[in-house]
UniProtKB/Swiss-Prot annotation:
The gene is betI. GO terms for molecular function: DNA-binding transcription factor activity; transcription cis-regulatory region binding. Residues 8-68 form the HTH tetR-type domain. InterPro entries: BetI_C (IPR039538), DNA-bd_HTH_TetR-type_CS (IPR023772), Homeodomain-like_sf (IPR009057), HTH-type_TetR-like_transc_reg (IPR050109), HTH_TetR (IPR001647), Tet_transcr_reg_TetR-rel_C_sf (IPR036271), Tscrpt_rep_BetI (IPR017757). It comes from the Bacteria. Gene3D superfamilies: Tetracycline Repressor, domain 2 (1.10.357.10). PROSITE patterns: HTH_TETR_1, HTH_TETR_2. It comes from Proteus mirabilis (strain HI4320). One of its GO terms (biological process) is negative regulation of DNA-templated transcription. Pathway: Amine and polyamine biosynthesis; betaine biosynthesis via choline pathway [regulation]. This is HTH-type transcriptional regulator BetI. Keywords: DNA-binding, Repressor, Transcription, Transcription regulation. Repressor involved in the biosynthesis of the osmoprotectant glycine betaine. It represses transcription of the choline transporter BetT and the genes of BetAB involved in the synthesis of glycine betaine. It holds the Pfam family TetR_N.
Length: 200
């Protein structure tokens, strides 16, 4: 008889093994056999919990997306009554959390983005992630800007976040949080200050 909680432990073990294998060989070559070997289990265990490789890859992406959502939510919770600028900066900080900028996470995200163009289930996850970021930014900018300006500011900052992350992921240098923060902070200030200047 299986121990209580063993299923969730085993699933987490397999997800971590999947992320490690993707980091080593890429998503295309991350076979069930390699993942099972990394996790120290039989191939059948993966089929039992996730049906197939696609099911396991989807679970791995949901795991990273959960970490992203948690990183953002925790920062926003601390700043529940703060001004828009601080909460927008918190959203940026959450997206640049170490859980999203480690070598393993970056390689997994890159592989995920590429695969999402051809796999409907991964594409849906990508759309959910994009909408969540845009919605969060749009709401916070909307506390200080008109609806149209908030939408443009949110789209611009979302593109800036993705662009800074992507450039770092494709470079050989570690992610520079200080540099990314400086660039995004200047953009946030520019958007909010422009509005204030026009109102005065």
């Amino acid at each position: 008889m299986p121990k209580i909680g063993m299923q969730s432990i085993r699933k987490q073990q397999l997800i971590q093994a999947t992320l490690a294998v993707i980091n080593e060989v890429g998503m295309q070559d991350a076979s069930i056999a390699l993942i099972a070997r990394k996790a120290g289990v039989s191939n059948g265990i993966i089929s039992h919990y996730f049906r197939d490789k696609n099911g396991l890859l989807e679970a791995a992406m949901r795991h990273i997306q959960y970490q992203l959502g948690f990183a953002v939510a925790m920062r926003l919770r601390i700043l529940s009554d703060a001004e828009p600028k601080l909460r927008i900066q918190a959203i940026v900080d959450g997206n640049f959390d170490t859980s999203q900028t480690s070598e393993t996470a970056m390689k997994t995200w890159l592989a995920f983005w590429a695969s999402s163009m051809h796999q409907p289930n991964l594409h849906r996850l990508q759309k959910v992630n994009d909408r969540r970021l845009y919605s969060n930014l749009c709401y916070e900018f909307g506390r200080a800007l008109t609806k149209d300006k908030a939408r443009l500011a949110a789209k611009g900052l979302a593109a800036l976040i993705d662009g800074l992350w992507l450039r770092s992921a494709l470079s050989e240098e570690p992610f520079s949080l200080a540099e990314a923060k400086k660039i995004t902070d200047e953009y946030i200030d520019m958007q909010l200050n422009l509005c204030q200047d026009k109102q005065t």
